[in-house]
Amino acid sequence: MEQDFQLVSVDAVNAKHVGTVFRSVYGNDFPIQYVYQPEAVAAEIAAERLTAVLAFDAAGQPAGYVSMFKNAPNFQLWEVGNMVVNPVYKQSRLSLLLANCCQNAELMNIAGSDGLYSEAVCHHYMTQVGSAKAGMADYALEIDQLAGSSFKEHCADTERISCVFNFIEYTKPSLPTYIPNVYEDMARTLLQPLKKRDILASTAVLPQQGNLRQEEKYYEFAGTWKLAVWETGATWSEDVAALLAEAARRNVVSLQVAVNMALPHLGAAVEELRKQGFFFGGVLPRWFGSDGLLMQVVLGGEPNFAGAKLYTQTARTLRQYCQADWELRKT
């Protein structure tokens, strides 16, 4: 007989059960240690940086967990986080129930957000399939983003792992989306599944005044450095060169720059990135509230495009496009 489960939002009262679920799979070795600390889990939820659901079995024992968290420059975006199922229930429908929680705005406490995204790993198909079933579309391909050695489950057979950026949109953006001429056709294709927005050609030149305004996330253990550029400023060429020099000093492998697509001079900013070796990654919808254009470079070796296992035709088309753009940069 099929096991019944009760799904409840995580709060300060039941947060003590989160660690129990993680221990059933990882022992005490899950790298994000706050999951074992009820007070820390409750604090993240209170600060609206985390939202999560627990599943309890018929006996009232914690059986599963799914979470979302905020990791984008736009605080109105949620990223699909961890899903953990006690091995006792691996053959049950619990994984599906937890995955479906991501579409339940009330249970997950995400009502009013701009959208939901995930970065689906490409050394197997499972996460990509789950994202597609949840109604997400593919918008970007982050080449060689993660270190393969960091995966104990579903061990990777490549040194680096790429990720597909999936997204589903809940609100309409208020700002226009500028697209560079060099990527116009692909950008328009990627934007099609989203809500209607004003799409304009980017023809403005780089500004002669103003300062670079950006946010960054540096993951030393993964060799990954991500930057979100709100404004390019007056010294964009020099800033890009300095970024590449610093990335080399840090032994970064995956360097990603998302540029605000609300900038009228986006095309000129992208052209400078291309001149210095960056190639196309895709679109990051609502990354700034407005959309973002992802440019990337793989340092220390050639990108492993062929190593990515891609589920959808969109992702496979995107790989061909990214690789062709990289080939142009190489020459």
Regions found by a protein language model. Name each.
Residues 1-4, 11-27, 174-206, 211, ...:
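A short, well-structured alpha-helix characteristic of acyl/acetyltransferase catalytic modules
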Residues 122-140, 150, 264-280:
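Conserved active-site alpha-helix within GNAT-family acetyltransferase domains
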Residues 146-180, 289-317:
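C-terminal "cap" of GNAT-fold acetyltransferases
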Residues 5, 9-89, 120-121, 215-224, ...:
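A conserved beta-strand-loop-helix scaffold within acyl/acetyltransferase catalytic domains
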Residues 80, 91-102, 108-109:
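Glycine-rich acyl-CoA binding loop
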Residues 106-121, 250-260:
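Conserved GNAT acetyl-CoA-binding A-motif
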Residues 188-282, 286:
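Non-catalytic interaction/regulatory modules that flank or connect domains
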Residues 117-119, 135-155, 279-290:
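Conserved catalytic-core motifs of GNAT/GCN5-like acyltransferases
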